[in-house]
Amino acid sequence: MADTRRVTDTLRRWAPILKVLAVLWLVLAIFMAIPLLVLIVESEPDALAFGLSIAIVLAAATLSWIVTWRIPVSLKPWQMFVLTTLSWVTISSFASLPLVLGAPQLSLTNAVFESVSAITTTGSTILVHIEDLSDGLKLWRGIMQWLGGIGIIVMGIAILPFLKVGGMRLFHTESSDWSDKVMPRTGGIAKATLSIYCGFTLLAAMAYYLGGMSPLDAVVHAMTSLATGGFANSDASFGAYAEQPQLLWMGSLFMLCGALPFVLYIRFLRGSRMALLRDQQVQGLLLLLLLVILALTIWRVSQGTPAFTSLTQVTFNVVSVVTTTGYASDDYSAWGATAYVAFFYLTFVGGCSGSTSGGMKIFRFQVAMLLLRDQLRYLIHASGVFVSRYNNQPLTDDITRGVVAFSFFFFLTVAGLALGLSLLGLDFTTALSGAATAVANVGPGLGETIGPAGNFAPLPDAAKWLLCVGMLMGRLEILTVLVLLTPMFWRQ
């Protein structure tokens, strides 16, 4: 009797999580049907792989729903932490099925690496001869990143501020409030965000097509640009369009659109026309991009590269790395030591909170600068009282603690991952840049192996699994995962 009660209590605690996961898996299966239809029309053998994958995902979703359908979804904070991590892990796992069963016939390690990289919108790849893949698989790679982009926006707007992860309480809005009274407004903001995301994607696809891309390439690059994911339909990434500068400028624009806060787009459409330009995150990101692009363009021109070519290539690749998209139109690691070091530093920055971008996020650097300024003030005026504000909100101890803790564990994770990779035999540059690009969800690293002109395929399997962990931890803002590893969390 006691055992039965214990099982029932356990089911009630975990049922809301399983029920939400069932819905997410169902959505994944529905989107798998899109490349399946393309493959059926083109009579490609990969259609069978997608059919089997859909059947497996639907079976898991149906079983979870049957077990939990009578139990209402009411999530407590601990369930939100578990759900956030499990959703990314399980979706990445299921998304890898077509890559294992399909024409590439990847090993489990390579398939999971590719899907984790896609869903987390990192953009690192182990695939070669991408041009030879079926249209369905090319489309699936784009869809995975596009779905990951949606998940990132929802997480950044509605979940992480609620969980107070890494100073994200700064961006607490009605969409971050999970009380019953506010849920209708949360749903409204979710619909508005999805509409804007889809609208930008359609606009990007049309622009790329009119700019000279094929219909399939236009659609895939539109999805991966807005998701700041970086998957392309060529081994050369955007280098395949290096002779078409109009496409590079379009790509720069749409990557930037994906890296800005989507909540501010909603405010803009609702009448607050200056919402974007007045936001300190946006101001900081645009200023950083302007200064870096200007400096590196001057550097490239001084090296003998034509001015317009320098400006185009620098703008595209700087925007790509800062927004953590990961496209490459040129091997910028060969631009010289100055550019090499600059791109390594830019790997950590990231875009804005509430966007599809990864990295540390620009607001944490801004908050750190405010904390540094206050500390210098205290040294000069020991009895002074200083209250810094960010976006007209006071920086409370709760927020500053979150930012400091996140920053510490972010770099600790990079350092630990780099050490693990070096123990597996990777050279210093590959280990350090690989760890940084994984945790920051950027995509390419530096050096000959995993740089903009390289690929992650040569790495040992153990290194790929470590990088998968790094990509997931980076996407889940580090602390969301670490809290699950503490005994205190499970006792409560």
From Swiss-Prot:
The keyword Acetylation does not apply. The chain crosses the membrane at residues 20-40, 47-67, 81-101, 143-163, 196-216, 246-266, 282-302, 334-354, 403-423, 465-485. InterPro entries: Cat_transpt, TrkH. Signal peptide: none annotated. Its main location: membrane. It is a multi-pass membrane protein. One of its GO terms (molecular function) is potassium:chloride symporter activity. It is found in: Cell inner membrane. The keyword Magnesium does not apply. GO terms for cellular component: plasma membrane. It holds the Pfam family TrkH. Medium-affinity potassium transport system. Probably interacts with Trk system potassium uptake protein TrkA. Main K(+) transporter in osmotically adapted cells. Belongs to the TrkH potassium transport family. PANTHER family: TRK SYSTEM POTASSIUM UPTAKE PROTEIN, TRK SYSTEM POTASSIUM UPTAKE PROTEIN TRKG-RELATED. This is Trk system potassium uptake protein TrkI. It comes from Halomonas elongata (strain ATCC 33173 / DSM 2581 / NBRC 15536 / NCIMB 2198 / 1H9). The gene is trkI.
